[in-house]
């Protein structure tokens, strides 16, 4: 039996697709075992994670967010995954170089997989209009992928509709020399982890209460994967991967106002993934790929203080794409046609939501709110056509050129639907309905045309290369003509790649948020007995954009040490936020979106690693140390994004001083300085691989909004919003993964892996409230992973 391995490499710009798609780049498992190493930090801003990189890293729930967690350009929302909710398996939000997490672009094989319906809303609260979403349209299982490339700076001109970065996932192609089937199982549970809980939260946590936070004191996670690679005919074959990731969480069914628990129930959190690619190497000139993809996510919830509030919330995405590569005499032409359906939904068990002064649930009586608000969903169908022409390299005098041109058209058919009528009201002491609102059944849509043209040229003279490019985008949603200049230069000082400098300027225009257009459609189905109405205005918005100045340095020190340094400066303009006002005459609440948001970010990282591993007694050792610093200031909450309503405030009180709001450090994703030591050990004779990450994070701050009852509130500044920062201590964490692939098994390739996250069981505070209640990161966690390849 043979095992396919792809050596870990760093790829850049236009070379990525060609290098990754080369069908002859495979080598045999029993001839040489891969030496695992930390993923290098590139100077050109493009980090490439091979399938071996994915196997090496402890990837937790197996999402793309987990894979990118240690990347120095990335910051996680430390308050999203904590000791309180470790049963959750959804992808976490990521910020790239200080940009909002909803302004990243996700792609699968080069086709957009971004959910731009309402990506900043990840609330699971029960509401008549709440449809939770996130920017990842497909919740991919990274164990099924061939590779993932993160473009965080110097992003090539073919990528657009983002402010932060681009994440491009590639599905595996078949390998004629490796017909095989692989089975995998991965698991953890609440008994295998340590939870750090504030004393003030312990009672609610142990009950498994829910509300703004869905506690998971008791859970089991079981992940199953199946993948295969099969040649069907000469030069024609298929790969496929299936996975189910499931978390079963036991929570309180109902908790009374007196804290009495009336029963417990099990709630499921499930993510299914199915990926397949048919490949036909028709000739030396033509290659065809047909890709099929599906992910489905469902989460069962209740609000434990509201009886009969059970609901299911989820996401379903599926699509197909056809790629044709044509090798011409003078160029390479790639044509892609695709269709993707991305949807989010909320489905309550009941259609009526009401509050009554006296209700009975089991043995509990008293005032309560109960019920649900029906079934509501929104979706978008994207129809994509794109083409790209790469000229062969040619010379004009002593200068070589390698230009490429491209065009893309996407038609987006977005719609929202309320599948049944629902209503909400309050029953007063007299037994009459008040605050009565009816949500009528309905469906509405909007269609958007998106056009893109781009071109770039790699110009080389001696040991200097320039990459000028320009991108044009237009859509009829906001009707803005956006021109994005892209420029990068590389100087190989001694023409031997020992000393290199990379620098450039780039502009990145963001993507549209479709919920702004769909919101008025949903609002038109709402009938308030009191006559209240809502209206949304967004039509005059500019497209938000980021300007980037970046520089990278690479220096080989001695024979085997490589040092790399990167600096990225980002300035975000025209970021979307909102303001609301009420017209009392018409009883209309008007929400107006504006371009008042702005941020400035300084990002720096420095890394040291070896060009070749150390060899000590049949053990290959690969060390790497990374220093990373990201600091942002601005008047925008990255988490709230376009739902942020504070940006109209020119001044605020910050730590007791009246200051300009845009001079205040950004509060979320605020983990400025991180230092990581990565150390991998590979013992080839036994098949043992031991990967380690030791990370130190400096003390940071949590932002608190002051109310008039807080001691730090300054009454003379009562006309201004007031904030203070509370210090959170520094932290040291150690994550490790030990894998064993017995070399004596010739017919079955068995791999057993164990992950220990936070080996030191560090108690790290990630947030605090204005009453001093702290939230902590998860403690020590064990995972077990077994796979077998036939």
Language-model region placement:
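Periplasmic N-terminal accessory/gating domains of Gram-negative outer-membrane beta-barrel systems
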Residues: 22, 39-156, 166, 170-172, ...
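Face-selective signature of the C-terminal outer-membrane beta-barrel domain
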Residues: 275-298, 311-478, 603-613, 617-628
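Transmembrane beta-barrel strands of outer-membrane/channel proteins
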Residues: 181-189, 240-244, 290-296, 335-341, ...
């Amino acid at each position: 039996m043979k095992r396919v391995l792809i050596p870990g490499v760093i790829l850049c710009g236009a070379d990525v697709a060609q290098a990754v798609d080369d069908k002859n780049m495979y080598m045999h498992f029993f001839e040489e075992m891969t030496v695992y190493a930390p993923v290098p930090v590139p100077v050109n801003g493009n980090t490439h994670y091979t399938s071996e990189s994915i196997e090496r890293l402890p990837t937790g729930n197996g999402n793309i967010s987990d894979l990118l967690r240690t990347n120095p350009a990335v910051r996680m929302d430390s308050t999203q995954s904590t000791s309180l909710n470790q049963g959750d398996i959804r992808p976490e939000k990521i910020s790239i170089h200080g940009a909002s997490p909803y302004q990243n672009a996700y792609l699968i094989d080069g086709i957009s997989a971004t959910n731009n319906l309402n990506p900043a809303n990840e609330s699971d609260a029960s509401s008549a209009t709440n449809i939770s979403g996130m920017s990842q349209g497909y919740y991919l299982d990274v164990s099924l992928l061939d590779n993932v490339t993160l473009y965080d700076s110097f992003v090539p001109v073919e990528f657009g509709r983002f402010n932060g970065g681009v994440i491009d996932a590639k599905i595996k192609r078949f390998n004629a020399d490796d017909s095989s089937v692989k089975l995998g199982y991965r698991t953890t549970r609440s008994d295998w982890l340590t939870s750090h809980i504030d004393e003030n939260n312990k009672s609610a946590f142990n009950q498994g209460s829910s509300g703004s936070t869905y506690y998971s004191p008791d859970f089991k996670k079981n992940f199953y994967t199946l993948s295969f690679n099969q040649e069907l005919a000469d030069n024609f074959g298929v790969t496929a991967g299936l996975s189910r990731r499931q978390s079963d969480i036991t929570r309180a069914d109902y908790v009374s106002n007196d804290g009495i628990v009336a029963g417990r129930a099990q709630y499921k959190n499930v993510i299914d993934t199915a990926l397949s690619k048919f490949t036909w190497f028709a000739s030396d000139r033509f290659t065809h790929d047909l890709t099929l993809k599906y992910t489905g996510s469902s989460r069962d919830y209740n609000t434990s203080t509201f009886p009969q509030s059970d609901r299911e919330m989820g996401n379903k995405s599926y699509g197909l794409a056809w790629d044709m590569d044509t090798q011409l005499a003078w160029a390479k032409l790639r044509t892609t046609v695709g269709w993707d359906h991305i949807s989010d939904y909320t489905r309550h068990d009941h259609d009526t939501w009401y509050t009554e002064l006296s209700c009975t649930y089991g043995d509990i009586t008293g005032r309560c709110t109960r019920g649900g608000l029906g079934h509501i969903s929104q979706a978008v169908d994207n129809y994509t056509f794109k083409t790209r022409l790469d000229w062969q390299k040619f010379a004009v005098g002593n200068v070589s050129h390698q230009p490429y041109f491209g065009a893309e058209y996407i038609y987006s058919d977005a719609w929202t639907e309320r599948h049944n009528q629902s209503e909400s009201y309050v029953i007063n002491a007299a037994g009459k309905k008040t605050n009565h609102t009816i949500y009528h059944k309905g469906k509405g849509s909007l269609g958007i045309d998106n056009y893109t043209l781009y071109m770039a040229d790699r110009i080389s003279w001696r040991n200097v290369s320039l990459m000028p490019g320009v991108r044009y985008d237009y859509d009829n949603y906001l009707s803005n003509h956006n021109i994005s200049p892209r420029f990068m230069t590389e100087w190989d000082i001694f023409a031997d790649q020992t000393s290199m400098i990379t620098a450039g300027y780039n502009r990145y225009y963001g993507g549209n948020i479709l919920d702004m257009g769909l919101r008025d459609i949903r609002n038109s189905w709402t009938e308030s007995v009191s006559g209240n109405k809502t209206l949304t205005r967004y039509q005059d918005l500019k497209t938000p954009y980021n300007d980037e100045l970046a520089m990278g340095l690479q220096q080989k020190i001695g024979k085997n040490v490589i040092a790399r340094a990167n600096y990225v400066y980002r300035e975000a303009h025209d970021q979307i936020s909102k303001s609301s006002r009420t017209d009392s005459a018409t009883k209309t609440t008007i929400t107006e979106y504006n371009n008042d948001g702005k941020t400035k970010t300084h990002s720096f990282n420095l890394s040291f690693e070896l060009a070749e591993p150390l060899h000590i007694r049949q053990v290959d050792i690969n060390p790497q140390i990374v220093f990373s610093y990201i600091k942002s200031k601005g008047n925008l909450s990255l988490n709230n994004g376009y739902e942020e309503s504070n940006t109209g405030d020119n001044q605020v009180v910050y730590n007791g001083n009246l200051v300009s709001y845009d001079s205040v450090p950004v509060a979320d994703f605020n983990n400025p300085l991180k230092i990581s030591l990565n150390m991998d050990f590979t013992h080839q004779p036994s098949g043992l691989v031991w990967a380690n990450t030791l990370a130190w994070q400096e003390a940071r701050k949590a932002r608190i909004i002051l109310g008039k009852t807080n001691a730090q509130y300054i009454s003379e500044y009562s006309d201004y919003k007031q904030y203070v920062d509370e210090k959170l201590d520094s932290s040291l964490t150690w994550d490790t993964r030990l894998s064993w692939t017995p070399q004596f098994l010739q017919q079955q390739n068995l791999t057993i892996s164990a992950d220990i996250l936070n080996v030191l069981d560090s108690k790290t505070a990630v947030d605090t409230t204005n009453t001093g209640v702290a939230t902590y990161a998860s403690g020590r966690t064990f995972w077990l992973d077994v796979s077998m390849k036939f």
